[in-house]
Amino acid sequence: MGERAYHGAQVCSGTNPRKCQDLGDSILLLLGSFILLNVWINVVTLLWKHLKSSLRILFRHFFPKDKQPSGSHPICICSSVDPKNLCSKVSSRVHPRPGFLLRRVNHLDSWIPDTNDEKVSACCCVPPKCGHAGVPRESARGLYKAGMMGGGEAPQVTASKAQASLLSRPETSSQFPKMSKLDTGPCHLPQESKTKTPDCAPAEAPAQAQVHSPTHTPVCTPTHPWTRSTDHTAVHTPAHSWTHSKARTPEGTHSQAQDTSAQAQAHTSAPTPAQTPAHIQAHTPAPTPAKASAHTKAHTSAQAQTHSPPHTPEYTHSQAHSPEHTSAHSPAQAPMPVPAHPQAHAPEYTSAHAPAYIPDHSHLVRSSVPVPTSAPAPPGTLAPATTPVLAPTPAPVPASAPSPAPALVMALTTTPVPDPVPATTPAPIITPIPSTPPAFSHDLSTGHVVYDARREKQNFFHMSSPQNPEYSRKDLATLFRPQEGQDLVSSGISEQTKQCSGDSAKLPAGSILGYLELRNMEWKNSDDAKDKFPQTKTSPYCSFHPCSSEKNTDSQAPFYPKFLAYSRDTACAKTCFHSATTAQSSVCTLPPPFTLSLPLVPPRSFVPPQPTNHQRPSTLIQTPTVLPTSKSPQSILTSQFPIPSLFATISQPLIQPQCPECHESLGLTQDSGLQRTPGPSKDSRVPRNLDLAQNPDLYKNPGLTQDPGLHENPGLAPNQGLHEFPGLPQDSYLCQNPSPSQDFGLHKNSGITQDSHPQKNTGLTQEAGILRSPCLTQSPGLHKKTPFTQTSDLQRSSGFTQDSGIYRNLEPNQETVIYKNQDLSQATDHQKNLGSSKDSGGHKNTGNVQDPGVCSTAGLTEDSGSQKGPYVPQDSEVNKSSGVIQESFLHKSPGLVQTSGLPKCSGLTQNSGDYKNPGLIQDCGGHKVKGLTQDSNLPSLTQATKVERRFSLPQDVGVYRSSEHSQDSNLHKCPGINQDPGPHKDPALVQDSGLPKISGLTQESGPYKSSCLIPDPSLYKNPSPALGSDFVQLLSLLQTPKSTLSLMKSSVPEKAAQKEDAQRHVLWARVQLNENSCPSKAQVVSNDLQTFSEVPVLIELQSSSWRAGSQHGAYRPVDTVPSGYQNYRQMSMPTHINWKSHCPGPGTQAGHVVFDARQRRLAVGKDKCEALSPRRLHQEAPSNSGKPSRSGDIRM
C-alpha cells in the first residue's frame, strides 16, 4: 500500500517532476538572465552616463565652441547706456518664452524669462556689433537728434542720450539679468523689448523711449520723444511701449518693429529697414479692425509704444504698415531715430507707426495698443499728431512716421489714439501692458536678450528722479516682488512713465495714471520689499507721477492693470496701488507722495486680476478680516444677543471673545438666556427672574419644596420637572440649555472650558453665554480659570458661566431663581449680582437648599457635582430653569462674576460657607448622597467640583469653597459636591440649617452677590468671592436680607425664610463684620458689583485689585460671624477667615480666580474631611491662600 501510495504519488508526479523541475530551472534561468540583464543594463547606463559626461567634458574642452551652440544663443543687448551689460546671452530656449509671454501679456510673471544670469554673458556683443553701441548708436542718436530737432526735439535727443544712459533699458536689461531671472532677457516688456531690443535695442530703446514721446494721442503729440511725456491721449498710449506697439487701428495695421532689440538698434543706430520688416512681423498683417483689436489687446502697449511720432514728420517712413504687417517701419524710413510710429492713426488707424529703426530689433511688440480699435475716427485725433509724421504712411495706416527712435522705445504707454483708446484701449490696454513684455517676446524670437524690465527700471530709476527710492521700497517691492512679471510691465510702464517724466510732458491720458519713474530700487527703504523681492536692492523701482492727465487717465480704462506704479505724487491717491491680485485699490494707503499704482489704473477702473500674494495690501484685507474677527465676537455678542447695557458694555467686551460662543450657542442666551427669557437685559433677567420667580416659585416652591423634600433627587426630579416645567418657559432654553448645560452652566462653569462645552451644550453657551456674555471673560477667566471645572460639569450643564458656582448656587437655587426673580426683580441688576449672588447665596441656600441644595451649593460646587448627578436633571432643570435663569441672572448679575465670586468665595462661600457649610456639613452626608448623585456626577463633579472647587473653591473657596468647598473640597471632593449638594441637600435636608445658612448663604449669596458684584470683575477672577465674600456678605447681607429673604421667602418661604433670616442675620453680622473689616471695599465692591452686576465681566476687574486688596480686607471680617452660622455658613465666616488666610492667595493671582478649587482641595485635601466644618474652609482657605485659586477664595 505504501508502495502503491508512493507509486500513486509517483504517478501523480510521474514524469511530471522532471518536467516541473526542468520548467522551474528554465524559469530560474530566465529570471536570472533577466536580472543579470537588468544589472548589466544599469551598469552600462551608469557607465555610459559617466562616459558621456567625460566625453562631453573632453569634447567641450577641445571644442569650446560647441558650448555656445549647445548653450543658449548669445543675445546681445547692446546698450551704450549700460556699460555693464551691452550684451547678454539669453538661451535660445528663452526666446520662445517671450512669445509665450506675449500670449500671456497680462501675466507679468510669465513675462519673466527663466534664464539664469549664468547664461547671460557680460557682453557678448560689441556695441558696433549691435550697431547700436558706440558710433552707430551715436549716429542713430544723431539722426534722432536731427529728427527731433526737426520736431523741435534736438535738445531732447541729447537728453534722450543721457536718459538712454540712465534709462537705457538695454542697460537695465543687462543689469537685470544679473539681478533676476528676468535679467536673462527673453522677457520682452513692450518697453523693454524695444529698449532692450536685443543687441542694440536696449541702448537704442532708451533713446527711442526718450525720443518716443508717443504722440499717438493728439494730446501727446510726440513732439519730444525724450520727454517721454507720452502725449498719449487719454488712453495715454504709451508711445514708449518698448515694443513699438503698432498702434493698430481697428484694422490692426500697426507697423511694429517687432524686434525691439533690432529695431531699437536700428533706431539707436541707423534704423535697419531690413530688420524692421522682419520684426515687423508683429505688425498685424491686415489693418482689419478685428485684427487690430486682437493685436490691440496684444499690442496695446505696443501701440502705446507706437510712437505716434507725428512730431517727427521727418520720419515719414511711416511704414504705413499696410495691413500686412509690413514691418513697415522700415528702419530706413525713419532713420534710426524715432520709429515713432505716429501711428498715424489716421482717423481710422493708429496702427502703422513702426519707426524706421524699429524694423529689426524693435520688437515692435505686439503690444499693439488697440488704440484705433475703435479708432478710425478717434485716431484722427492722434492722426493730427501722427499725421504730420504720417506723410509716407501707406493707406492702411497713416504713415507711421517714426519719431526719433527713443520715442519708439518709449511707446510703452500702449495708448491707442486718445479717442480710439477710450473705446478699445481700456480692455486692450490692460493687456498691452503685458504686451510690453511681448515686445520682449518678439525680440526674444530674434534671439535678442531683452533686458529685464526691472533692469530697465533700474536704469530708468537712474534716469528718473532718484526720489523714487524714497518710496517705500517695501510696498513697491512687495508689489514687485510678488509681481515680478508685473515688475517687468511696471518697468515698462515706468520706463514709459520715465520718459514722460523725463520729458516732463503732460502725462498720457490713457490708462497711465501718471508717469512712472523707474529707478533701481535699493530695497533698504523697505525690508518687506526685500522680502518680496530678493533682488530688491537691484529691483527697479517705479515712481508713478500722476500727471494732471493721469486723472483723466484714471477715468479711462486702466492700461496697466498689472503694473506697479509707485507714485510720489499725492495725485496717486487717486491712483491706487493695486496688486494685480488685489481687487482692492488701496495703494492710496501708500504715502500720497509715494503711491503705488500697480495697475496704473484709477482705482475705480482697476480690476485686480492677479495673485493676492503680490500685494502687501492684501493685508488690508487681512486686517479687515482680523478686525471682523476681533470684533465679530463682540459684534456677534452685541448684535446677536441683546445685552444689558452694563452687561453689554463690560460683559460684551470681556465676554465677547467667549461670549460669541456662548452667544452663538446660547448667544448671550445666558445673557440671552437670562436676558433671553426675560430679555437680554437684566431687566429681562428680572422679568425672567420674575418669571423665574414664578418658575422658581414653581420650581422653587415646588422645586424647592420638592427640592427641599426631594431636594436631592426628588428635588431634582421635581426641580427637573418643576424647574424644567415651570422653568422651561423661560428657562426652557435656559433651563434646557442650561438643562443639559444646567450643570452645564455650573459644570461648564466649572471650566469655562467646560463651560464652553456645556455652555456649548446648551445653556452653557446660553448660561455660559450669559455668564460668558456677561461674564464670559469672567466665566472663562473664572470658570475657566477656576474653571468651575467642577462647576464645569454642573455648571457646564447649568451654566458655568452661569456663575457656575453662583449660577449653580443661584442656579442650583431654584430658589435662587425665585430669589433672583424676587430679589432680582427687586435688585435685578444689583441683586442680580447681589441677588444672583444672593440668590446664589440665599437662594442657593434657600433654593439651593431646595433646588438645590444641590442646585444651590451644589449649584456651584455641587452643582458641579450634585447638580450634575441628580442635580443635572434637577439642577439641570431647576437649576437650569431657575438656576440658569438664576445663573443667567447670576451670571448676568455678577452671575458670572458671582460665579467667579460666588463660586469663588462669596456666593458660594457664603452659600457654601454658611449655606453650604450648614448644608454642606449636613449635606455632606445627605448632600453627598445627593451630591453624590451629583457626586455621582460628583466624580465628574468632584472633578468638576474640584475644578469647580478650584473655581468654586477659589470662588467659594473663601466662602463657599472654604466652607463648602473646603468642605466641599472635602465634601465636595469627598462629598465635595455633596458638600455642595450637602448644603443643597442639607438645605433641602438641612435645608433649614441650610436655610439659615441659606440666610448665610443668602447672606453669602449677598456677599456672593457682593462678591459677584465686586468679584464680578475682580472677585470673579480673584476668587472674587473672597473679596466679594466679605463684601458680598456685606453687600449681600445688606441686599441679602432683602433678596435672601425674598428669595428665601419665595423659595423656601418657611424654612428658607426662617433659616434665611437667621442665617442672614448671622451672615449679615458676619458680612457686616466682613464688611467692617473691608467695608469700603465691600461697599465699593458692592457698588461696583451693582454697577457691574449686569456685567459679570467685572469679575476680572475684581480679580486683581479685589483679590489683592479687597480680598484680604474683605475676608478677614468674616471671622466674626457666629460659629453656628459659620458652621452652616462654614465658609461664611470661615471663608472670611479663609479669606484672610487666603489673603496671600489673592495676592497670588490678581485678576484671576486664583484659588483653584482643585488646588484648594488639594491643599485642603486634609481639610476636605473637615469640609463640613467651617474652619476647614478657613484652614483650607488659608492653605490655599497661597494658592492663586485659593487666594481668590480668600479674597472673597
Swiss-Prot record:
Residues 150-345, 367-402, 669-762, 775-806, 826-877, 960-1009, 1168-1196 are annotated as: Disordered. The keyword Nucleus does not apply. Keywords: Membrane, Transmembrane, Transmembrane helix. The keyword Transmembrane applies. The chain crosses the membrane at residues 27-47. Residues 391-402 have a biased composition (Pro residues). It comes from the Eukaryota. The gene is SPEM3. This is Uncharacterized protein SPEM3. Residues 212-227, 253-279 have a biased composition (Low complexity). It is a single-pass membrane protein.
